[in-house]
Amino acid sequence: TLGFFPEIIGTLPDYRGAEACNVAGTIITALKLAESGMGDYWDEAESWVRNHFVELQLLDTTWIQRLPMRHAIMGFPMPHRSVIDERYMCNDRVVDRIIGSFAPSACPNDWARHFLGITGCCTGNANRAWYHIWQNILYHDGGKLQVNLLLNRSSKWADVDSHIPYTGQVDVKIKEPVDLSIRMPQWVSSS
């Protein structure tokens, strides 16, 4: 599935956005449930990570630099210079400084359709999700190594190099002797 979880349903029919907070929280919940054995949600979590979550992170800012400069976003007027505290606000290299942040309300095909801005909660929660994703790619215990998510990961036991979605190949380079098991997603044929 895509991993698009709308933040508002019903009250604003033309508003179709998913906060990175929503997507991050849903991924973390799926990982925690799968990790604890309360359900097999590995496929869902990996699908949501690959499809919508990675696209929520701002890595390419060239499109922002091409936008016409605006002094205000509708509904968010710029404060008068007399109330700007330069200890907390600046307009110096803002685009360069927001690389790595997350979309506050993205649609499946638009990074910012309704609100062109950054919110601290989305960036914080999404980075917390990256931690849980990273931790759950591999699980090591007592000489046994389990690959749960077919995503790239380096560790002292093994490196996982995923070529998905470009090819159906995942390489695991073993660095220490381990009993290796790899969880096969439901979409992998048994033949």
Tell me what each language-model feature is.
Residues 1-191:
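Glycan-recognition and catalytic cores of secretory/periplasmic carbohydrate-active enzymes
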